[in-house]
Amino acid sequence: MARVTVEDAVEQIGNRFDMILVAARRARQIAVQGKDPMVEEMNDKPTVIALREIELGLVNAHTLDADERQTVREREAAEIAAVSAIAEGRSL
């Protein structure tokens, strides 16, 4: 198995600081939020998986922002549906 190097991921993002932010956000999605990895896990930790995804061009700041906006929209839609159900006297 080839080792992931930070330089490979930096080339995809543009600079080390943004790469660190993107990798941390993606690793948190995988570890805490239960998002599925876009690459084979191979017993790697979430940070290594995130770096591999960045290296392959599967993840960047824009894709993370879009995913986050979609998650917020889904959460808001569920909340609106719950409030509507309560207002109509239905239970979920």
From Swiss-Prot:
Q: Name one GO molecular function term.
A: DNA binding
What is the uppermost EC class here? transferase
Question: What SMART domains does the database record attribute to this sequence?
Answer: RNA_pol_Rpb6
Catalytic activity field: RNA(n) + a ribonucleoside 5'-triphosphate = RNA(n+1) + diphosphate
Q: Which SUPFAM superfamilies match?
A: RPB6/omega subunit-like (SSF63562)
What keywords appear on the UniProt entry?
Answer: DNA-directed RNA polymerase, Nucleotidyltransferase, Transcription, Transferase
EC numbers listed for it are 2.7.7.6
Q: Name one Pfam family in it.
A: RNA_pol_Rpb6
Domain of life according to the entry: Bacteria
**InterPro entries in the record:** DNA-dir_RNA_pol_omega (IPR003716), Pol_omega/Rpo6/RPB6 (IPR006110), RPB6/omega-like_sf (IPR036161)
Biological processes annotated in GO: DNA-templated transcription
One GO cellular component assignment for this chain's record is: DNA-directed RNA polymerase complex
Would the keyword Lipid metabolism turn up in this protein's UniProt record?
A: no
Per the entry, what this protein does is: Promotes RNA polymerase assembly. Latches the N- and C-terminal regions of the beta' subunit thereby facilitating its interaction with the beta and alpha subunits.
Similarity comment: Belongs to the RNA polymerase subunit omega family.
Q: What is annotated about its quaternary structure and interactions?
A: The RNAP catalytic core consists of 2 alpha, 1 beta, 1 beta' and 1 omega subunit. When a sigma factor is associated with the core the holoenzyme is formed, which can initiate transcription.
Name-wise, this protein is: DNA-directed RNA polymerase subunit omega
Source organism per UniProt: Shewanella baltica (strain OS155 / ATCC BAA-1091)
